[in-house]
C-alpha cells in the first residue's frame, strides 16, 4: 500500500495540462541548460558494411541477366601475362567468362585445391587447378616474332571480318585455326565421355 500511495503522489505532482504538454518537444533536464554537456554528439554515423552475395556482385540488366563484357581475347588465343604474380608467362586461353571479363589460361595462375574423398575407401586429394585471371592483365602474343601486341580489326577483300596483331600484322582469326580448335575440343570431350563411362 505504501508503494501505491507513493506512485499516486508522484502522478499528482506531474501536471499534464494542454498548456504544459511536452508532446513533440525535446526533453532537456534543467541541469543540462546551465552546464554544457561533456559528451559530443556523433557527427559521422557509423558505416554498416554488408558482404554481397555472388549473384549481387555482377552488374545486371533490367531483366536480371548479367551484363556481358566485350574482351580483346577469344578462346584459343595465345596470350602473355603482363601483370600480376605470373607476369611473363605464355599460354593458351582455354575458358572465357564474359560476365566478369576473366579468362582461364593453360598452366597459368595455378591454385591448390583440397578435394574431399567421395567414397569411404577413397583418400582425399590435393590438386592444382587453373584459376581465372582478368583479361586486362594479358596481351596477345605472336609465337613467330616473340612479341606482344594490341589487337586490331579489319575487313578482308572477301568481306570477312578478322582480328590481327597491330605490331606484326599477323592474322589471328583464320578459318583453318578455328577448325583445328573445334576438332581438338570435340576430341577432348569424347575422351572425357569415354573415361567417365568406363
UniProtKB/Swiss-Prot annotation:
GO biological process entries: plastid translation
Record-linked SMART domains: KOW
UniProt keyword terms in alphabetical order: Chloroplast, Plastid, Ribonucleoprotein, Ribosomal protein, RNA-binding, rRNA-binding, Transit peptide
SUPFAM superfamilies, alphabetized: Translation proteins SH3-like domain
UniProt note: phenotype after gene disruption: Reduced plant size and pale green leaves.
Annotated transit peptide: 1-50
Matching Pfam families: KOW, ribosomal_L24
Main subcellular localisation: plastid
GO cellular component: chloroplast; chloroplast envelope; chloroplast stroma; plastid; ribonucleoprotein complex; ribosome
Cellular localisation: Plastid, Chloroplast
Record GO terms (molecular function): mRNA binding; rRNA binding; structural constituent of ribosome
Family membership noted in the UniProt record: Belongs to the universal ribosomal protein uL24 family.
Complex formation: Part of the 50S ribosomal subunit.
NCBIfam families hit by this protein: rplX_bact
PANTHER family documented for this protein: MITOCHONDRIAL RIBOSOMAL PROTEIN L24
Functional description taken from the UniProt entry: One of two assembly initiator proteins, it binds directly to the 5'-end of the 23S rRNA, where it nucleates assembly of the 50S subunit. Required for optimal plastid performance in terms of photosynthesis and growth. Required for the translation of plastid mRNAs. Plays a critical role in biosynthesis of thylakoid membrane proteins encoded by chloroplast genes.
Protein name: Large ribosomal subunit protein uL24c
Gene source species: Arabidopsis thaliana
Phylogenetic placement of the source organism: Eukaryota, Viridiplantae, Streptophyta, Embryophyta, Tracheophyta
Gene field: RPL24
Amino acid at each position: 500500500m505504501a508503494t501505491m500511495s507513493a506512485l499516486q503522489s508522484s502522478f499528482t505532482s506531474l501536471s499534464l495540462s494542454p498548456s504544459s504538454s511536452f508532446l513533440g518537444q525535446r526533453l532537456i533536464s534543467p541541469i543540462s541548460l546551465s552546464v554544457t554537456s561533456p559528451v559530443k554528439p556523433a557527427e559521422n554515423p557509423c558505416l554498416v558494411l554488408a558482404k554481397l552475395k555472388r549473384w549481387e556482385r555482377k552488374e545486371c540488366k533490367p531483366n536480371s541477366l548479367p551484363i556481358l563484357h566485350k574482351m580483346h581475347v577469344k578462346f584459343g588465343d595465345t596470350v602473355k601475362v603482363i601483370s600480376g604474380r605470373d607476369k611473363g608467362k605464355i599460354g593458351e586461353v582455354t575458358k572465357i567468362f564474359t560476365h566478369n571479363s576473366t579468362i582461364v589460361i593453360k598452366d597459368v595462375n595455378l591454385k591448390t585445391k583440397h578435394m574431399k574423398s567421395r567414397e569411404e575407401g577413397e583418400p582425399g586429394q590435393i590438386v592444382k587447378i587453373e584459376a581465372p585471371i582478368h583479361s586486362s592483365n594479358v596481351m596477345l602474343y605472336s609465337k613467330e616474332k616473340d612479341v606482344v601486341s594490341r589487337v586490331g580489326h579489319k575487313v578482308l577483300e572477301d568481306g570477312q571480318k578478322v582480328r590481327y596483331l597491330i605490331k606484326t600484322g599477323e592474322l589471328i582469326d583464320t578459318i583453318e585455326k578455328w577448325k583445328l580448335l573445334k576438332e581438338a575440343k570435340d576430341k577432348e570431350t569424347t575422351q572425357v565421355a569415354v573415361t567417365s563411362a568406363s
